[in-house]
């Protein structure tokens, strides 16, 4: 789950990490009220969407007067915004964050994440903040520093001070940096986060460090014990079909192609998409119907796939271990009848009760195309889509 900047800053402040004073507003007049409550300007007005790169898209404005604040908020609120991170998708701007604005002396980068390669929690820091860390890694990798956290020792003050000096900070600032690192570690663990990125972590004209922007990503597997974080979810920022899928507990990700996929198991689902592409097709989605799939779940999966008008064919690829192929076949038949599927459907079944499942499909009288294996199925669905065009 992703978070808005203002939500990230609330959590950072809760854990003693300094952020500029600010508050969200939903109307231009509210934005002016917030600005006045923060004292004398200047101020920053920032559109709240689940994406970075807002500045280049006109979503971050420096304002010297309250008239500027009102004009900036009026221009942003109620619009839709896309950035280089949204892949052309426009996200609604329902809120703006109004904060105090100090003069930036230096921008740094700091993040904490789970490094699956080293199987540790890892810090990444750079003296080059305010830009994409991938760009820094490609052009000046020597400016990136990392620390793998020992689970027994945890993060200590000397780790942060050492990091701070590597980034060119003075003694006072290195001490602040150490405090931020220690508090960030507590936040990361307490809230079951997968990523916290502070970019930039800036030195302002008062000589102190502030988190000017924060990007959070939580571990959805821990949602059951992080009710406060779940309550922060903004579904207006998410793909509508993906929201519906999450409510049905179906793993679904929208993609750009025209061949819908219904598969059980994440690994098989990814392999299915790969084989479709190898055969000249483009998957329209990732959909893992799960190992405990039943008839109703299959029907709901078909509805999700066909909610996109881009889908011109469907490939059902099921390996029945826990799930029974005959039950999947019943679900496919029911779905085709109930949903009124008008695109080619290719089905590959293997595993438990596979012969019973295939017989049900044959006896259904429906134009369901059988496949012997994953490659055969991918070829047939790509061909069927081309022939139907």
Curated annotation (Swiss-Prot):
InterPro entries: ATP-grasp, ATP-grasp_succ-CoA_synth-type, ATP_grasp_subdomain_1, Succ-CoA_synthase_bsu_CS, SUCC_ACL_C, Succ_CoA_ligase-like_bsu, Succinyl-CoA_synth-like. Binds 1 Mg(2+) ion per subunit. Residues 9-244 form the ATP-grasp domain. ATP binds at residues 46, 53-55, 102, 107. PANTHER family: SUCCINATE--COA LIGASE [GDP-FORMING] SUBUNIT BETA, MITOCHONDRIAL, SUCCINYL-COA SYNTHETASE BETA CHAIN. Heterotetramer of two alpha and two beta subunits. This is Succinate--CoA ligase [ADP-forming] subunit beta.
